[in-house]
């Protein structure tokens, strides 16, 4: 499939492609970017969903109100969200080496990208879930639903549209972060832009 795409793009762009960058390199960079986005978004969604749900249910008035958990998790999410990605990328190098075995490359970039996008998605998910009408939760409680059933069968389905919109926003943010990661050795489109764009600019 990959060879077919490279061959097809080469034929299409041959008349006007005037660059030392080959189509094969371009497709490889796209593949690396897709890999970083897909896995970081997958792990980030899982982590973000846990954070978002926890923030909603443990806040004051939540169905599992717990001030201790909320007042620890809330500032932690804010702190991680406000941390510039390039600083986070460097700060988690020891953790990346433990988990992946190296701090350079596409797989290594997935660790800081996941840590970066998780709290961001967590806050967006929290916002979406808080938009659900209180009456729906009260109705679920009146029917005898437990907290897990309330979240999974009532709140999340009701917030589905908002969750999809916020997931799109998170994905766009993540793509921007992958370009930044590529500039420091992660590969992908960011690496391509630095190697064949900025460094060769005359």
Question: Which role does the model predict for each range below?
Answer:
Residues 95, 166-202:
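Non-cytoplasmic
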